[in-house]
């Protein structure tokens, strides 16, 4: 049992297995630092990029972007674990070197009956592991304190990735970056590092996610890299 923001989170057998699987893709073990990247625009910062690349485990989500040689460094160049969903708009990085990464499929709306889709953008031999809704969604919903069952709500993919890092790696430093809703919980539109924008889906409650993330940041081991 770990204490996160004064709330006990029980690490079940399924979540322990998920942690072990994530660790196998880490750059170094034992894992002492985990970086989690959302996709909000980030300006150039060698310090931020280095902190991310120096992390033992780097988790990215959906339409992520990586630093490339010859361009200003912003968000680092590694992706060990990718948490993504079926409606992700792939970037040129999403499935690049996919055989070297762990892909965790977040599909919370399947819990509420949304049909399964298989995007043509996925590599035909893409191996992935679905996140266990039964173990994750109730815990996240309770921590967010939202009527997720009654109103068919779902956490954002970015928050899900951060929740996994904070809760499955309680002994580690957690480095968060690219989460715009922490500073703007009332936003109704996402803007992306890769470019473009989209509306915040109606099933999300980013005000609650911002509140929980702000609570995490009160812990010395959790930091936000703006």
Residue ranges and their predicted role:
Residues 2-226:
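Metal-ion/cofactor- or nucleotide/acyl-coenzyme-handling active-site neighborhoods
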């Amino acid at each position: 049992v770990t204490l996160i923001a004064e709330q006990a989170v029980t690490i079940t057998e399924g979540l322990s297995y998920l942690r072990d699987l994530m660790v196998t893709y880490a750059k170094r073990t034992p894992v002492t630092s985990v970086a989690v990247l959302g996709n909000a625009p980030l300006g150039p910062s060698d310090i931020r990029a280095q902190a991310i690349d120096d992390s033992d485990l780097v988790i990215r989500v959906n339409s992520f972007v990586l630093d490339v040689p010859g361009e200003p460094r912003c968000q680092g160049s590694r992706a060990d674990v990718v948490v993504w969903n079926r409606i992700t708009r792939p970037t040129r990085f999403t499935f690049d070197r996919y055989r070297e990464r762990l892909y965790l499929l977040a599909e919370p709306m399947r819990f509420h009956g949304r049909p399964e889709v298989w995007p043509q953008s996925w590599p035909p031999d893409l191996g992935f592991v679905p996140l266990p809704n039964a173990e994750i969604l109730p815990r996240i919903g309770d921590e967010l304190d939202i009527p997720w069952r009654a109103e068919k709500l779902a956490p954002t993919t970015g928050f899900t990735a951060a929740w996994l890092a904070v809760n499955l790696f309680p002994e580690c430093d957690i480095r968060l970056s690219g989460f715009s809703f922490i500073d703007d919980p009332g936003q109704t539109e996402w803007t992306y590092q890769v470019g473009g924008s989209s509306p915040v889906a109606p099933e999300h409650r980013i005000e609650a996610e911002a509140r929980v993330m702000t609570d995490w940041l009160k812990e010395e081991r959790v930091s936000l890299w703006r």
